Amino acid sequence: MTFSSAADFQDEFDVIVVGAGHSGCEAALACARLGCRTLLLTLNLDKIAWQPCNPAVGGPAKSQLTHEVDALGGEIGKMADRTYLQKRVLNASRGPAVWALRAQTDKREYAAVMKGIVETQANLVIREAMATDLILGANEQVLGVETYFGTCFAAKAVILTTGTFLGGKIWIGGKSMAAGRAGEFAAVGLTETLNRLGFETGRLKTGTPARVDKRSVDYSRMEPQPPDDEVRWFSFDPEVWIEREQMNCHLTRTTAATHQLIRDNLHLSPIYGGFIDSKGPRYCPSIEDKIVRFADKESHQIFIEPEGRDIPELYIQGFSTGLPENVQLAMLRTLPGLENCVMLRAAYAVEYDYLPATQCYPTLMTKKIEGLFCAGQINGTTGYEEAAAQGLVAGINAARFALGKELIVFPREESYLGTLVDDLCTKDLREPYRMLTSRSEYRLVLRSDNADQRLTPLGREIGLIDNRRWQLFQSKQANIIAEKERLHETRIKERDQVAIAIVKDTEQKIKGSLSLADLLRRPSLHYLDLDRYGLGNPDINLAEREGVEIEIKYSGYLKRQQNQIDQISRHSNRHLSPDIDYMKIETLSMESREKLTKIKPATIGQASRIGGVNPADINALLVYLEMRQMSAVKS
């Protein structure tokens, strides 16, 4: 690291963001929109917000994150709505807590549109450079960064959003090269700086499948996966809702020949050949991992997805591998429909450095260096949506730090975004982290449809929601409240013609009279049915109708979960001072003392989720806090 006395600054900023992927773009835009002069450093100005793996946004839990980022004033949801090739709602037959919108996006259009947004954003400067060193003050606080060629930039806060580029190395078979992703060089120097400053770093692995030429594929041998007829939106802002022609994806499957070919060549893969031992993503395994871990499965689904409207490349989802190129091509040609395929890009594995996020506060500022924030894959996550969510959190807090304002913690009970950050900062994760609906204990109340209700008021308070968005939000909430009141107050009598028709269709009796709200609570009846019987409200839109139906139909469950949240939060949100010396609290087990000392949780709730800290330790900690408070009062 360089100290300020040795630095000759070329320019001064409030915040510097290192890396212009999905995390870096959200962070930089948030900082600039909050009034901070911001510098966004990238290794390649032509690869801003690139989608190096699957060009898609959303899916289970990831769609909730995307809606939440949008509700706070972020960009990823708008980007997906502007550039989609296909949209589908996954899990539509199940409850609203797990509904998941997914968009296949146009890879090049996505990057071009985002590049235009960051280039025209006020307060935001973009520069092509590799940051290799941090410039620190006398108290080891951040003062700026130094690039590979020795240029120094000053800043009050720095956000590291380095993706897979820190010490990146790509592998195909037993051969490797230094690269953050294929065709782009790795970032050097920064890992060594972090190590010198006392940070723990580790290695993780991910991978991407081959791309094939769509002109060499026989679609008649595959099952079409059409888009939904009714287009849904990630953003709560109708200004970015662009209706456009959609494209099919396709489904094929692995065969016995595929599996045999993989088994015969396992020794040539980077992992099974022993060339690398970094942990890969559990929920996005390579095809080799699938064949080994699920040896009893005769076949695996493979989705064939377009990467753009005007390019020939197809993404082979579910077929990532690190096997040699000649083996890859032979494997691809065992898939029905791909017997004569032409491979345009080979699949590869990539390993990279990361910084376990237990070294960060839930604000994503590091505990060791004041003013240094980390977001995205450097924190051990995988996925564009996880990266974007962290980028927004880090951007908001870096801006507030630079402006001398109090930093914000997003509680896990109020958002998936909060759950994500809490897990990262609390749990000792040693494999790439992916957001899942099962990771949230509060998923009934943390739905996509109410992300704006939960987070837009906070986005407004922070300063990321403008007057137009705020008026849209207030109008929607007022319409939902008014419609719920109407449904509770409007009753139908058993002798009414409409009631007789409903009884006949549903085979459920109406005794005396029934409110429309009680009618809507029936499992088999939906708001669309109210419309059919002339009982709906034509003045409210689809999102408002869904919000009304969910809140009425699931009101009992939602109330119960909200009560649980309120009960837990009484103790969970109790603050733990960073100066507590846990090693001196003898009523704690030694393991919990060590874990608490290492992680320094911000709240009792965070402490309770640390592995090795049991309920008895939490009780002892609560007693300690009471005694500490009493002695403070006495003194």
Curated annotation (Swiss-Prot):
Its cofactor is FAD. GO terms for biological process: tRNA methylation; tRNA wobble uridine modification. It comes from the Bacteria. It is found in: Cytoplasm. Keywords: Cytoplasm, FAD, Flavoprotein, NAD, tRNA processing. FAD binds at residues 19-24. NAD(+) binds at residues 280-294. One of its GO terms (molecular function) is flavin adenine dinucleotide binding. Its main location: cytoplasm. One of its GO terms (cellular component) is cytoplasm. It holds the Pfam family SAM_GIDA_C. NAD-binding protein involved in the addition of a carboxymethylaminomethyl (cmnm) group at the wobble position (U34) of certain tRNAs, forming tRNA-cmnm(5)s(2)U34. Belongs to the MnmG family. Homodimer. Heterotetramer of two MnmE and two MnmG subunits. PANTHER family: GLUCOSE INHIBITED DIVISION PROTEIN A, PROTEIN MTO1 HOMOLOG, MITOCHONDRIAL. This is tRNA uridine 5-carboxymethylaminomethyl modification enzyme MnmG. It comes from Microcystis aeruginosa (strain NIES-843 / IAM M-2473). The gene is mnmG.
